[in-house]
Structure formats: structure tokens, C-alpha cells
């Protein structure tokens, strides 16, 4: 049936609905928001373009309408108030998620739950813990977008199609994330070797510049236009495609870890096999010892916040 429900019709939720409608992968898309008028307006606006794309039924609904959904995407959440700490915001969003997830589970406990709201790693773990859903059926957008930014910036440097660049940003979707430089390659050629071939410099300063631009990307965009939503909507579309097409594609989604690199009791991003039933497997990359240590530090950052939450 390929039915999707999107909880939250803000910038990210509405743009995700539009992007999914354009993709033609869903037969039904439901928009649900506390502001019903906003959801109805977005649904109408997108629906009026359906004659130009593949047929799709798109409408605003309520929690009862998530029944029969194959994927439930959650983009809803509170925005940070002036002077509010990150931890206070996390606590507020945790309370919001407890309410949302409880309502959703009553209606649909067979869907795959895809979390997009930030901080996505923490809220993915919160959803997993309070939903009682089987492992693999709760995942977050994680560093799928960060990895795309990484490949894009490398593609500009190397003048190569980003689809031919293989590299990952892993760990937290946030300031403690890390680039897995030790395995980054172009057509199987390690990035340092490729840079030598094309005459481009790939010294430490180059790596720092690329990585810092990845980490700072959202801040830069928010400073210029107030929010990010186009690229993340495309990242969500890519995850949805992998699920509906049962691709077993490798994407850096966020999910509860089960001992990878010695890490448990936290959700973080690692390259994961994604198919019809959600996460099939999490891959452990042959990282350097320095990268493994950085990944574990990223886990501790998230764990320290989770320990402050009532879940």
C-alpha cells in the first residue's frame, strides 16, 4: 500500500511531504499537526500539483489516520526558546515525544518509526525505549544528511560526482560527530591517494576545513535563512525509498547500538543495512584506533544527556 504518515507539518514535515509526493513512491501521505489548519493548507497546496506527478492521495488527518501506515515519520517538536539550555529543550521534547508516541502506538504498532526531530539520536532512543517496538523498527535520520554534505564537499574539491565518493560521518548528528577518514575513498582509491593523483592537496588543514564545514553547515544555513529543510527532506526520502523498495542499502541512520565498538544503551549513526523491515544490520567499519576513541566519546556525550531524562 505504501502509506506514510508525517507527524509535524512545519518546515521539515511539509517539505518532506512535498519531496515524497514528487518521488512517486507513496500512494498515500497523511500530514498531522497540532495546528490542523497548517496541515490542511500544506496538504491542499501539494495536492493541487498532483496532476503534474504520479498519483498520490495527500490529506491532513489526526492520530487515528496513522492506522495502516507503513512508515510513520516524526518531525514534530518544540523549538529552542531564548536562554533555554540544550538539556532543557531535550527534556521538553522528550515529554512531547512521550505523548506523541503513546498516541501513535495505540493506533499503529506495526509501522517503521522514522525520527527526524532534533536532537535526533536522543529522540530515536527515547522512541525506542517508550514504544516497545522491536529492534530495527525505530530509526533516526541520523547522519545521512551529514554524510551527504561530506561527499558533496569532497566532490567539489576533487571535481568528482559525489555518488562515486564513499565516505561516512558517524556518531552523533551534532557537534561530536566524526568523519571516518581512514576508509574514505573514490572508486576504491583512498582519498589521500586520489588527491595525489589529481594534484589536489589533502593535508590535515584540508581535512579540518572539510569536516568543519560539515559540522557548521546547519548553523551557516540557519544564520542565512532561519532553518534547514530541503536537504534533510531529500535524506528522509532516500531512507523511505530504501525501506519501500527493500533495497538493503547502506545508510548512516541512527539506531540503538548493540555493542558496536563496545557501545550500548545509546542511539548513534553507523552505516546500516536498511530494507523493508527497517534496520537489517549495523556495520562495524575498520576504523582507526583514533576514530574508535572519538566514536566512543561521541557516545558518552549522548549518554550523559539520556541519563538526565525520565525514560
From Swiss-Prot:
Please name the GO terms of the biological process aspect recorded for this protein, alphabetically: glycolytic process; lactate metabolic process
What reaction(s) does this enzyme catalyze? (S)-lactate + NAD(+) = pyruvate + NADH + H(+)
Keywords on record: Allosteric enzyme, Cytoplasm, NAD, Oxidoreductase, Phosphoprotein
- Annotated Pfam families: Ldh_1_C, Ldh_1_N
- Keyword Oxidoreductase in the entry? The reply is yes
Binding of beta-D-fructose 1,6-bisphosphate, residues: 151, 166
Primary location group:
cytoplasm
Residues bound to substrate are 80, 86, 118-121, 146-149, 228
Q: Which residues form the active site?
A: 173
Q: What class of enzyme is it?
A: oxidoreductase
Which SUPFAM superfamilies does this UniProt record tie to the protein? LDH C-terminal domain-like, NAD(P)-binding Rossmann-fold domains
Gene3D superfamilies assigned to the protein according to its UniProt record, in alphabetical order: Lactate dehydrogenase/glycoside hydrolase, family 4, C-terminal (3.90.110.10), NAD(P)-binding Rossmann-like Domain (3.40.50.720)
Q: Name one GO molecular function term.
A: L-lactate dehydrogenase activity
Phosphotyrosine found at: 219
Q: What does the record give as the function of this protein? A: Catalyzes the conversion of lactate to pyruvate.
Subunit structure, as described in the record: Homotetramer.
* Protein family: Belongs to the LDH/MDH superfamily. LDH family.
Record-given protein name: L-lactate dehydrogenase
Native species: Thermoanaerobacter pseudethanolicus (strain ATCC 33223 / 39E)
Amino acid at each position: 500500500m505504501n502509506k506514510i504518515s508525517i507527524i509535524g507539518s512545519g518546515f521539515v514535515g511539509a517539505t518532506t511531504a512535498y519531496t515524497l509526493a514528487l518521488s512517486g513512491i507513496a500512494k498515500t501521505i497523511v500530514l498531522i499537526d497540532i495546528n490542523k489548519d497548517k496541515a490542511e493548507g500544506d496538504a491542499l497546496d501539494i495536492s493541487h500539483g498532483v496532476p503534474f506527478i504520479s498519483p498520490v492521495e495527500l490529506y491532513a488527518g489526526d492520530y487515528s489516520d496513522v492506522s495502516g501506515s507503513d512508515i510513520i515519520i516524526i518531525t514534530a517538536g518544540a523549538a529552542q526558546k531564548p536562554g533555554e539550555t540544550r538539556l532543557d529543550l531535550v527534556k521538553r521534547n522528550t515529554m512531547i515525544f512521550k505523548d506523541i508516541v503513546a498516541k501513535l502506538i495505540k493506533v499503529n504498532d506495526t509501522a517503521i518509526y522514522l525520527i527526524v526531530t532534533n536532537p535526533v539520536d536522543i529522540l530515536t532512543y527515547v522512541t525506542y525505549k517508550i514504544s516497545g517496538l522491536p529492534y530495527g523498527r525505530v530509526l533516526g535520520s541520523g547522519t545521512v544528511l551529514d554524510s551527504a554534505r561530506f561527499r558533496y564537499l569532497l566532490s567539489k574539491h576533487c571535481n568528482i560526482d559525489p555518488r562515486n565518493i564513499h565516505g561516512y560521518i558517524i556518531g552523533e548528528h551534532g557537534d561530536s560527530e566524526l568523519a571516518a577518514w581512514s576508509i574514505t575513498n573514490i572508486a576504491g582509491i583512498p582519498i589521500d591517494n586520489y588527491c595525489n593523483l589529481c594534484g589536489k592537496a589533502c593535508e590535515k588543514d584540508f581535512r579540518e576545513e572539510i569536516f568543519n564545514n560539515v559540522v557548521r553547515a546547519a548553523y551557516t544555513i540557519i544564520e542565512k535563512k532561519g532553518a534547514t529543510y530541503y536537504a534533510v527532506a531529500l535524506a528522509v526520502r532516500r531512507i523511505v525509498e530504501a525501506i519501500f523498495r527493500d533495497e538493503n542499502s547502506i545508510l548512516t541512520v541512527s539506531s540503538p547500538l548493540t555493542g558496536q565498538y563496545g557501545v550500548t544503551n545509546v542511539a548513534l549513526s553507523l552505516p546500516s543495512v536498511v530494507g523493508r523491515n527497517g534496520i537489517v544490520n549495523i556495520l562495524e567499519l575498520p576504523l582507526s584506533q583514533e576514530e574508535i576513541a572519538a566514536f566512543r566519546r561521541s557516545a558518552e556525550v549522548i549518554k550523559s544527556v539520556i541519563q538526565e531524562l525520565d525514560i
